[in-house]
Curated annotation (Swiss-Prot):
The lineage of its organism: Archaea, Methanobacteriati, Methanobacteriota, Stenosarchaea group, Halobacteria. Pathway: tRNA modification; archaeosine-tRNA biosynthesis. This is Archaeosine synthase. It comes from Haloferax volcanii (strain ATCC 29605 / DSM 3757 / JCM 8879 / NBRC 14742 / NCIMB 2012 / VKM B-1768 / DS2). Residues 516-584 form the PUA domain. GO terms for cellular component: cytoplasm. Disruption phenotype: Cells lacking this gene lack archaeosine in tRNA and accumulate preQ0-modified tRNA. PROSITE patterns: PUA. GO terms for biological process: tRNA wobble guanine modification. The gene is arcS. The keyword tRNA processing applies. It holds the Pfam family TGT_C2.
Amino acid sequence: MTDYFEVHARDGAARIGELRLSDSVTTPAVVDDVLADAGSLWAAERELPDGSDDVLTVLPHRSLPAGSADEVRESFSVAYPDVDFPSAAVVTADTADDFGADAYVLSDAQGFVGHARAFRDNVIEAKENLPADTALVLSGVATPRNVSLLVYAGVDLVDEKLARARGLEGFYLTSDGEYFLEDLDELPCACEACRKPASEFTRADAADHNANALRAELARVRRRVRDGRLRDYVEGQARHDQWLTALFRRFDQQYSFMEQRVPVIRDSELTAASEESIDRVEIQRFADRVTKRYRNRFDNPLVLLPCSAKKPYSESQSHRQFQEAVQYRAHMVSMTSPIGVVPQELELTYPAQHYDSVVTGDWSEDEKSFVAEVLRRYLERNDYPRIIAHLPPGAYTDIVERVADDLDLDVEFTVSEHPTTTESIGNLMRTLDGEPKFTREEREHNVVKALADYQLGPDAGDALFSDVALEMTSRYPKLQVWNDAGVQLATMVPQYGVLSFTLEGAKVWRDSDAPTKTVEIDGFVPHGSVLAPGVVDADEDIRPGDEVVVEGPKAFAIGRAEMGGRELVESTRGIGVEIRHVEER
């Protein structure tokens, strides 16, 4: 149980936290000024310190180097006492466990920083073994260049030791590199240490500058985490050092570790500006849900369309032309890099309306392969009487032809030169001649069911609403879902493209065959939010931002999770669920 560290915001594994000392420290941060080391037990026996609320006290410890044998670790393990002051325990990834501390220092960090695979494996093992609501500390490894990646991986606290040491060795550090002092004609910084001519700049000044640069970079990182856009930043930062590039890619390979920490909804823009953007959890998750959860419910032909720069697609000039040509006679699905395929019902769902990519007209082979794989999986799951490709010649048509050949499908192409030319629009209209129209009501019902599929699981839309006579009020995209008894079940949230349930809707969800995400609470009636100490249990597959049913002996509620399932159970501080509706039992 931690009393002195609390997480306030999350962006994947990165977190904004509070080290609750007399003067609180917002993390991620440098900890030099508030860290008190009680000493190593290798040198001598140590008395348990009195501790203080002013500092984070590292309890007496035995640090072991990276690669120490298991029997050595066991022989020299330390029994950490329970204390009533802010404390940190020293561990390795192998020995990491809940010792009742507020923070944990990885003693062998200097042995694996610089080695991407070892860093990834050690940090992930430590994060999986330590309590979710404690701080992770890495000492002697942080620089302005690498600290954003350290935070991205889940590190909360660092120190200035390496940055200052490099300065005393004659190196001037920046967020994108390092320079020999003698190579600097001018100082590319305006911090207090740099307010002198380069000719008068000493190694001691460099140490001060490096510490200032590290603190400034951490401030930038904290802002990015608050905005939910740290990933956008580290995609660029990783380019400044080969091991950081390797580390970045290694963490992308750990989908499970990252996915359980990445929110399912955000209102911030997702910038897809590099090849690695395809590997983002948000993009992989969307593609996975579209091809495993979503199911087309229209009986009409499929029309494949290009994406548009404007989001949502339906509000773009080109897609309005396509809609006028289609006239409710076909199911429209957009193809895009790096998202994959976007059925019209999910065009508002994060990240389909939130991403922005570099538009050059040229697709890399990786982009083509990814979109082709998503389209192939989509067409394997969804049957259509006809497939019409209203796509510009080039990458789009290459992808469709590749998939059509693999699946032995017939595809009708309708574009001459460009999708919005008069000739191309006319071709699309004529190709759909004689096809029956679906109604606006049918479209709206299918939107609601598709959102339920995407949010909750395969066929959830039918499980929730097949036995309910749905009535829609308001117009798309602000749909409200009512049953035939005049009781509201849910509302579509245009900002995120998800369903927000009422209490009655939550009961329908709970009693249906759709997978239910449930948070079990203690015997109280929550008002506004459920704090983590009140959580008794929670489904492991809950992600931050998920719609969740909250049940306890005295209350039934519906709300949105602020933490993942594991964190809900393990945390002793912080808001676990934001409650929307509640009733007493």
